[in-house]
């Protein structure tokens, strides 16, 4: 982890993370940084199948004192997911006002909640699946978009995530291994689904001519990240 002084554009500190980081979030009160250590799988090994150790984890950085004095705590995420539980591949992290981090485990199709103060997993659950109807799953030549097929039990496999309140967060369901649901979902912290956009993103892209038929037999629009704001 490299710490940079923005005003002077100089590096002021480094902290060894002991693995391959993917994303980072800083708590609103400035007490913690949460760094996802994905230890990403090698897609050229065994066809990209997992498990491929070492397992991923979450690193909590305690932002106490000068950056050179910051310390790291590691939170194990193994044994949580029903899919490939020995090899969690955390992807993205977001922190709410109570300093609870939500972490996506994309290839595991799982979500974990971590209390940054205690460094403990306070909850976790599967991201679940959806059945997509009136979807185009065919790569035609010449390009032709036809929303007339069904894709049953498609794993969401979320990538980006953001809190939308203290008790709800939204995920961008890109898919990376066997899933991807072409949209986004709003979850409650108990794992229940408050809202799922279904095929609406795909239809809106088609209406404005931004549908690439070559992607229809794969993961469609592949939403990778999500942000939240009030206007």
Please give the residue ranges for each predicted region.
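Beta-rich catalytic cores
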Residues: 20-22, 54, 89, 107, ...
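Short, conserved, GDST-rich strand-edge loop motifs in beta-rich repeat architectures
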Residues: 36-56, 171-182
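C-terminal substrate/ligand-recognition segments
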Residues: 215-231
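Surface-exposed loop and turn segments in beta-propeller and other repeat-based domains
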Residues: 64-88, 123-152, 192-219
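Residue-level detector of Asp-centered blade-edge/turn motifs that repeat once per structural unit
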Residues: 26-30, 96-98, 164-166, 230-231
């Amino acid at each position: 982890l490299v710490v940079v002084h923005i005003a002077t554009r100089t590096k002021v500190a480094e902290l060894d993370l002991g693995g391959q980081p993917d994303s980072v979030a800083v708590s609103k009160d400035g007490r913690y940084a949460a760094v996802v250590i994905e230890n990403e799988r090698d897609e050229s090994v065994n066809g990209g199948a997992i498990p491929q150790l070492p397992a991923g984890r979450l690193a909590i950085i305690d932002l106490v004192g000068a950056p050179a004095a910051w310390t790291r705590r590691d939170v194990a995420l193994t044994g949580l997911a029903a899919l490939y539980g020995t090899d969690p591949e955390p992807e993205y992290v977001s922190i709410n006002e109570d300093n609870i981090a939500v972490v996506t485990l994309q290839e595991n199709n799982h979500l974990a909640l971590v209390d940054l103060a205690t460094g403990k997993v306070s909850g976790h659950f599967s991201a679940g699946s959806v059945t997509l109807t009136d979807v185009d799953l065919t790569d035609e030549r010449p390009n032709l978009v036809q929303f007339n097929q069904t894709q049953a039990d498609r794993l969401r496999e979320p990538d980006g995530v953001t809190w939308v309140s203290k008790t709800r967060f939204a995920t961008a369901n890109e898919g990376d291994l066997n899933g991807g649901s072409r949209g986004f979902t709003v979850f409650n912290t108990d794992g229940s689904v408050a809202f799922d956009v279904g095929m609406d993103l795909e239809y809106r892209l088609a209406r404005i001519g931004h549908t690439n038929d070559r992607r229809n037999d794969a993961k469609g629009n592949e939403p990778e990240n999500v942000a939240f704001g009030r206007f």
